[in-house]
């Protein structure tokens, strides 16, 4: 809940909504793939946001404030709580290769409302 009101992901398609991205800038090998994926998502969305704290980003998806989140490399302490909250609110979580989140190791993270889970399969990751 948020201030006593149950939260839920939005039902907006990405072309009417936002995506949130993380940069993993400390891992230089992910700079170009991150920018490529950002460009692909910008072509399919209204805009994007970059807040800098993955758990906050994932909770924004849970509350319906944005439709999709991705980052190429997050440690479990960066994504586990937020991904769990978002899944409880109706989000679908996976790695960028479509695998289930491992919960115990570093991985890429894709989180989307059900209306946008298909977008992952349309992207060059």
What residue spans do the PLM features occupy?
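Acidic beta-strand-loop-alpha-helix segment within the catalytic core
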Residues: 1-58, 106-125
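Oxyanion/phosphate-interacting regions
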Residues: 36-42, 56-125
């Amino acid at each position: 809940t948020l201030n006593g009101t149950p939260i839920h992901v939005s039902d907006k398609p990405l072309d009417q909504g936002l995506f949130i991205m993380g940069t993993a800038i400390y891992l230089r090998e992910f700079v170009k793939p991150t920018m490529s994926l950002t460009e692909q998502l910008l072509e399919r969305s209204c805009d994007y946001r970059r807040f800098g704290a993955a758990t906050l980003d994932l909770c924004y998806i849970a509350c319906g404030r944005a439709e999709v989140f991705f980052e190429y490399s997050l440690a479990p302490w960066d994504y586990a709580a937020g991904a769990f909250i978002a899944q409880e609110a109706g989000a679908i979580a996976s790695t960028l290769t479509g695998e289930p989140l491992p919960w115990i190791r570093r991985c890429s993270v894709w989180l989307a409302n059900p209306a946008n889970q298909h977008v992952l399969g349309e992207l060059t990751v």
